[in-house]
Protein backbone atom coordinates (compact mmCIF):
# COMPACT_ATOMS: atom_id res chain seq x y z
CA UNK A 1 0.00 0.00 0.00
CA UNK A 2 1.20 3.53 -0.77
CA UNK A 3 2.25 5.22 2.46
CA UNK A 4 2.26 8.99 2.80
CA UNK A 5 5.28 10.96 3.95
CA UNK A 6 6.34 14.58 4.13
CA UNK A 7 7.89 14.64 0.65
CA UNK A 8 5.92 14.83 -2.57
CA UNK A 9 7.13 13.25 -5.78
CA UNK A 10 8.03 16.70 -7.10
CA UNK A 11 10.24 17.27 -4.06
CA UNK A 12 11.92 13.90 -4.53
CA UNK A 13 12.85 15.13 -8.00
CA UNK A 14 14.39 18.28 -6.54
CA UNK A 15 11.55 20.70 -7.26
CA UNK A 16 9.51 22.83 -4.84
CA UNK A 17 6.23 21.28 -3.64
CA UNK A 18 4.10 23.64 -5.73
CA UNK A 19 5.91 22.92 -9.00
CA UNK A 20 3.90 21.97 -12.07
CA UNK A 21 5.79 19.23 -13.89
CA UNK A 22 4.68 17.37 -17.01
CA UNK A 23 5.83 14.40 -19.00
CA UNK A 24 4.60 14.61 -22.59
CA UNK A 25 4.49 10.94 -23.48
CA UNK A 26 4.09 9.46 -26.97
CA UNK A 27 2.45 6.04 -27.02
CA UNK A 28 2.53 3.23 -29.59
CA UNK A 29 6.02 3.48 -31.10
CA UNK A 30 6.74 0.38 -33.15
CA UNK A 31 3.17 0.13 -34.40
CA UNK A 32 3.82 1.67 -37.83
CA UNK A 33 6.58 3.57 -39.60
CA UNK A 34 4.39 6.71 -39.65
CA UNK A 35 4.11 6.58 -35.86
CA UNK A 36 7.85 5.96 -35.43
CA UNK A 37 8.82 8.79 -37.75
CA UNK A 38 6.50 11.35 -36.20
CA UNK A 39 7.25 10.38 -32.61
CA UNK A 40 11.02 10.41 -33.00
CA UNK A 41 10.92 13.79 -34.72
CA UNK A 42 8.75 15.11 -31.89
CA UNK A 43 11.17 13.71 -29.30
CA UNK A 44 14.11 15.33 -31.04
CA UNK A 45 12.25 18.65 -31.03
CA UNK A 46 12.32 18.57 -27.24
CA UNK A 47 8.67 19.28 -26.45
CA UNK A 48 7.67 15.62 -26.37
CA UNK A 49 9.84 14.20 -23.61
CA UNK A 50 9.17 10.47 -23.39
CA UNK A 51 7.70 7.57 -25.33
CA UNK A 52 7.03 3.85 -25.09
CA UNK A 53 7.55 1.02 -27.57
CA UNK A 54 5.29 -1.89 -28.57
CA UNK A 55 7.57 -4.91 -28.77
CA UNK A 56 5.17 -7.32 -30.56
CA UNK A 57 4.44 -4.90 -33.41
CA UNK A 58 5.86 -5.15 -36.95
CA UNK A 59 7.82 -1.89 -36.82
CA UNK A 60 9.47 -2.55 -33.47
CA UNK A 61 12.85 -3.41 -35.07
CA UNK A 62 12.96 0.09 -36.56
CA UNK A 63 12.35 1.82 -33.26
CA UNK A 64 14.72 -0.56 -31.45
CA UNK A 65 17.48 0.54 -33.83
CA UNK A 66 16.58 4.14 -33.06
CA UNK A 67 16.83 3.43 -29.35
CA UNK A 68 20.30 1.94 -29.79
CA UNK A 69 21.54 4.90 -31.78
CA UNK A 70 19.90 7.43 -29.44
CA UNK A 71 20.75 6.13 -25.95
CA UNK A 72 19.68 9.39 -24.31
CA UNK A 73 16.14 9.14 -25.70
CA UNK A 74 13.66 8.54 -22.89
CA UNK A 75 11.98 5.33 -24.03
CA UNK A 76 9.96 2.77 -22.10
CA UNK A 77 7.98 -0.31 -23.05
CA UNK A 78 4.27 -0.16 -23.87
CA UNK A 79 3.43 -3.67 -22.66
CA UNK A 80 1.03 -5.07 -25.24
CA UNK A 81 -1.51 -7.88 -24.95
CA UNK A 82 -4.19 -6.81 -27.44
CA UNK A 83 -4.27 -6.32 -31.21
CA UNK A 84 -7.18 -3.98 -31.78
CA UNK A 85 -6.96 -3.33 -35.51
CA UNK A 86 -9.13 -5.20 -38.00
CA UNK A 87 -6.53 -5.96 -40.67
CA UNK A 88 -3.25 -4.86 -39.09
CA UNK A 89 -2.51 -7.50 -36.45
CA UNK A 90 0.21 -8.81 -34.17
CA UNK A 91 0.64 -11.67 -31.75
CA UNK A 92 2.79 -12.79 -28.87
CA UNK A 93 6.55 -12.59 -28.47
CA UNK A 94 6.50 -15.75 -26.36
CA UNK A 95 5.88 -19.05 -28.22
CA UNK A 96 2.18 -19.47 -28.94
CA UNK A 97 1.99 -22.76 -27.07
CA UNK A 98 3.18 -21.01 -23.90
CA UNK A 99 0.46 -18.32 -23.96
CA UNK A 100 -2.65 -19.88 -25.58
CA UNK A 101 -5.15 -17.90 -23.50
CA UNK A 102 -3.81 -14.65 -24.98
CA UNK A 103 -4.26 -15.64 -28.63
CA UNK A 104 -7.18 -16.09 -30.99
CA UNK A 105 -7.60 -18.95 -33.46
CA UNK A 106 -5.29 -17.21 -35.95
CA UNK A 107 -2.48 -16.69 -33.45
CA UNK A 108 -3.06 -12.98 -32.92
CA UNK A 109 -3.76 -11.17 -29.67
CA UNK A 110 -7.47 -10.62 -29.21
CA UNK A 111 -9.07 -7.43 -30.47
CA UNK A 112 -10.78 -6.97 -27.12
CA UNK A 113 -10.48 -8.93 -23.90
CA UNK A 114 -14.19 -8.50 -23.25
CA UNK A 115 -14.72 -11.37 -25.69
CA UNK A 116 -12.31 -13.65 -23.84
CA UNK A 117 -12.69 -14.17 -20.11
CA UNK A 118 -10.07 -16.92 -19.91
CA UNK A 119 -6.95 -14.74 -19.74
CA UNK A 120 -4.39 -16.68 -17.71
CA UNK A 121 -2.29 -14.54 -15.37
CA UNK A 122 0.68 -16.91 -15.50
CA UNK A 123 0.68 -16.67 -19.29
CA UNK A 124 0.48 -12.89 -19.05
CA UNK A 125 3.66 -12.91 -16.99
CA UNK A 126 5.38 -15.20 -19.49
CA UNK A 127 4.50 -12.80 -22.30
CA UNK A 128 5.50 -9.65 -20.42
CA UNK A 129 8.89 -11.13 -19.59
CA UNK A 130 9.30 -12.22 -23.21
CA UNK A 131 8.64 -8.66 -24.34
CA UNK A 132 11.17 -7.35 -21.84
CA UNK A 133 13.82 -9.82 -22.95
CA UNK A 134 13.19 -9.16 -26.65
CA UNK A 135 13.63 -5.43 -26.08
CA UNK A 136 16.81 -5.88 -24.07
CA UNK A 137 18.26 -8.30 -26.61
CA UNK A 138 17.70 -5.71 -29.35
CA UNK A 139 19.49 -2.97 -27.46
CA UNK A 140 16.59 -1.12 -25.84
CA UNK A 141 17.23 0.04 -22.29
CA UNK A 142 13.78 1.06 -21.06
CA UNK A 143 13.28 3.79 -18.48
CA UNK A 144 9.75 2.74 -17.50
CA UNK A 145 6.80 0.47 -18.27
CA UNK A 146 3.21 1.23 -19.19
CA UNK A 147 0.28 -0.73 -20.57
CA UNK A 148 -1.26 -0.60 -24.04
CA UNK A 149 -4.92 0.39 -23.72
CA UNK A 150 -4.35 0.31 -19.93
CA UNK A 151 -5.28 -3.38 -19.99
CA UNK A 152 -2.91 -4.33 -17.19
CA UNK A 153 -3.99 -1.36 -15.11
CA UNK A 154 -7.75 -1.63 -15.41
CA UNK A 155 -8.41 -5.38 -15.70
CA UNK A 156 -8.26 -6.26 -12.03
CA UNK A 157 -5.86 -6.72 -9.16
CA UNK A 158 -4.34 -10.00 -10.36
CA UNK A 159 -3.13 -8.69 -13.71
CA UNK A 160 -1.99 -5.38 -12.24
CA UNK A 161 0.13 -7.28 -9.75
CA UNK A 162 1.65 -9.31 -12.58
CA UNK A 163 2.74 -6.07 -14.23
CA UNK A 164 4.04 -4.76 -10.94
CA UNK A 165 5.99 -7.96 -10.29
CA UNK A 166 7.66 -7.76 -13.70
CA UNK A 167 8.47 -4.08 -13.17
CA UNK A 168 10.06 -4.85 -9.82
CA UNK A 169 12.07 -7.71 -11.32
CA UNK A 170 13.57 -5.35 -13.89
CA UNK A 171 13.82 -2.44 -11.41
CA UNK A 172 11.61 -0.13 -13.46
CA UNK A 173 8.84 2.28 -12.48
CA UNK A 174 5.41 1.92 -14.04
CA UNK A 175 2.96 4.56 -15.21
CA UNK A 176 0.24 4.75 -12.59
CA UNK A 177 -1.48 7.87 -11.30
CA UNK A 178 -3.54 8.86 -8.28
CA UNK A 179 -6.32 9.89 -10.67
CA UNK A 180 -7.14 6.20 -11.07
CA UNK A 181 -7.30 5.20 -7.40
CA UNK A 182 -10.99 5.96 -6.86
CA UNK A 183 -12.15 3.80 -9.78
CA UNK A 184 -9.52 1.09 -9.33
CA UNK A 185 -8.81 0.91 -5.57
CA UNK A 186 -6.65 -2.21 -5.93
CA UNK A 187 -3.97 -0.04 -7.51
CA UNK A 188 -3.37 1.77 -4.25
CA UNK A 189 -3.44 -1.37 -2.14
CA UNK A 190 -1.07 -3.24 -4.48
CA UNK A 191 1.57 -0.54 -4.82
CA UNK A 192 4.49 -0.65 -2.45
CA UNK A 193 5.82 2.33 -0.47
CA UNK A 194 8.74 2.79 -2.88
CA UNK A 195 6.72 2.65 -6.11
CA UNK A 196 6.54 5.86 -8.11
CA UNK A 197 2.99 7.24 -8.37
CA UNK A 198 2.23 10.21 -10.59
CA UNK A 199 -0.27 12.81 -9.44
CA UNK A 200 -2.38 13.38 -12.56
CA UNK A 201 -2.87 12.39 -16.18
CA UNK A 202 -4.31 14.11 -19.25
CA UNK A 203 -5.24 12.50 -22.56
CA UNK A 204 -7.41 13.46 -25.51
CA UNK A 205 -10.99 12.28 -25.20
CA UNK A 206 -12.92 10.59 -28.03
CA UNK A 207 -15.59 12.87 -29.42
CA UNK A 208 -13.60 16.12 -29.25
CA UNK A 209 -14.00 17.80 -32.67
CA UNK A 210 -10.83 18.38 -34.65
CA UNK A 211 -11.20 22.16 -34.44
CA UNK A 212 -11.36 21.92 -30.63
CA UNK A 213 -8.09 19.96 -30.33
CA UNK A 214 -5.86 22.91 -29.31
CA UNK A 215 -8.53 24.27 -26.96
CA UNK A 216 -8.74 20.92 -25.13
CA UNK A 217 -5.03 20.79 -24.43
CA UNK A 218 -4.66 24.50 -23.67
CA UNK A 219 -7.50 24.29 -21.14
CA UNK A 220 -5.83 21.28 -19.51
CA UNK A 221 -2.58 23.22 -19.22
CA UNK A 222 -4.33 26.27 -17.74
CA UNK A 223 -6.03 24.03 -15.16
CA UNK A 224 -2.93 21.98 -14.37
CA UNK A 225 -2.48 21.29 -10.67
CA UNK A 226 0.86 21.15 -8.86
CA UNK A 227 2.64 17.82 -9.01
CA UNK A 228 3.71 15.44 -11.76
CA UNK A 229 1.29 15.01 -14.67
CA UNK A 230 1.67 12.75 -17.69
CA UNK A 231 0.06 13.98 -20.89
CA UNK A 232 -0.50 10.86 -22.99
CA UNK A 233 -0.42 11.54 -26.73
CA UNK A 234 -0.48 9.47 -29.91
CA UNK A 235 1.55 11.25 -32.60
CA UNK A 236 1.76 10.00 -36.16
CA UNK A 237 1.72 11.19 -39.75
CA UNK A 238 -1.59 11.15 -41.58
CA UNK A 239 -0.21 9.25 -44.57
CA UNK A 240 -1.34 6.31 -46.68
CA UNK A 241 0.30 3.72 -44.44
CA UNK A 242 -1.28 4.92 -41.20
CA UNK A 243 -4.66 5.52 -42.83
CA UNK A 244 -4.68 1.91 -44.03
CA UNK A 245 -3.53 0.50 -40.69
CA UNK A 246 -6.18 2.40 -38.72
CA UNK A 247 -9.00 2.61 -41.26
CA UNK A 248 -11.62 0.80 -39.19
CA UNK A 249 -12.20 3.83 -36.94
CA UNK A 250 -11.26 7.47 -36.61
CA UNK A 251 -10.50 7.25 -32.88
CA UNK A 252 -6.70 7.06 -32.51
CA UNK A 253 -6.57 6.96 -36.31
CA UNK A 254 -4.27 8.74 -38.73
CA UNK A 255 -5.92 12.18 -38.59
CA UNK A 256 -6.13 11.98 -34.77
CA UNK A 257 -2.41 11.25 -34.56
CA UNK A 258 -1.50 14.03 -36.96
CA UNK A 259 -3.40 16.51 -34.79
CA UNK A 260 -1.51 15.34 -31.70
CA UNK A 261 1.78 15.69 -33.54
CA UNK A 262 0.89 19.15 -34.84
CA UNK A 263 -0.12 20.54 -31.45
CA UNK A 264 2.79 19.19 -29.43
CA UNK A 265 5.40 20.32 -31.95
CA UNK A 266 3.78 23.71 -32.49
CA UNK A 267 4.19 27.19 -31.07
CA UNK A 268 0.92 27.21 -29.10
CA UNK A 269 2.12 24.44 -26.83
CA UNK A 270 5.54 25.99 -26.32
CA UNK A 271 4.01 29.35 -25.46
CA UNK A 272 1.48 27.79 -23.09
CA UNK A 273 4.25 26.13 -21.09
CA UNK A 274 6.12 29.38 -20.71
CA UNK A 275 2.97 31.30 -19.79
CA UNK A 276 1.90 28.81 -17.12
CA UNK A 277 5.39 28.24 -15.66
CA UNK A 278 5.19 24.51 -16.42
CA UNK A 279 8.37 22.45 -16.60
CA UNK A 280 8.93 19.44 -18.84
CA UNK A 281 10.47 16.36 -17.24
CA UNK A 282 11.16 12.77 -18.31
CA UNK A 283 10.64 9.24 -17.11
CA UNK A 284 14.40 8.95 -16.82
CA UNK A 285 14.24 11.39 -13.91
CA UNK A 286 11.50 9.31 -12.31
CA UNK A 287 13.48 6.13 -12.89
CA UNK A 288 16.42 7.62 -11.01
CA UNK A 289 14.10 8.65 -8.19
CA UNK A 290 12.68 5.14 -8.11
CA UNK A 291 16.15 3.64 -7.84
CA UNK A 292 17.00 6.09 -5.08
CA UNK A 293 13.81 5.29 -3.18
CA UNK A 294 14.43 1.57 -3.41
CA UNK A 295 17.98 2.01 -2.17
CA UNK A 296 17.17 4.38 0.69
CA UNK A 297 13.84 2.93 1.76
CA UNK A 298 12.25 6.40 1.80
CA UNK A 299 8.66 6.91 0.71
CA UNK A 300 6.86 9.49 -1.40
CA UNK A 301 3.55 11.04 -0.57
Say what each PLM segment does.
Residues 174-177, 249-301:
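C-terminal domain-boundary segment and adjacent tail
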Residues 90-115, 246-253:
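Active-site gating loops and adjacent loop-to-helix segments of metal-dependent hydrolytic enzymes
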Residues 121, 125-213, 222:
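Catalytic domains of cell-wall/extracellular-matrix polysaccharide-remodeling enzymes
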Residues 29, 56, 78-84, 148-150, ...:
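Active-site beta-loop-alpha junctions enriched in small/polar residues
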Residues 21-23, 48-52, 72-78, 142-146, ...:
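Structural preference for beta-strand elements that scaffold enzyme active sites
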Residues 12-14, 39-45, 62-74, 91-104, ...:
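Acidic (Asp/Glu)-rich catalytic clusters
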Residues 33-58:
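A short alpha/beta connector and helix-capping loop motif
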Residues 1-23:
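N-terminal pre-catalytic segment of deacetylase/amide-hydrolase enzymes
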Amino acid sequence: MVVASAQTLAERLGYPPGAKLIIVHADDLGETHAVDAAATKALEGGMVTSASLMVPCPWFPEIADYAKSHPDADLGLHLTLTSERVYYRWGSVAPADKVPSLLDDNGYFYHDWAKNEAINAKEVEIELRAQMERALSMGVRPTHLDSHQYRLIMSGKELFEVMLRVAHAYKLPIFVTRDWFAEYPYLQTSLGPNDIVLDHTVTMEPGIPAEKWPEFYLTALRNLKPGVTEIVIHPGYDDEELRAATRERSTWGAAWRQRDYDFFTGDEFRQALAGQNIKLITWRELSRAYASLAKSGKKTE
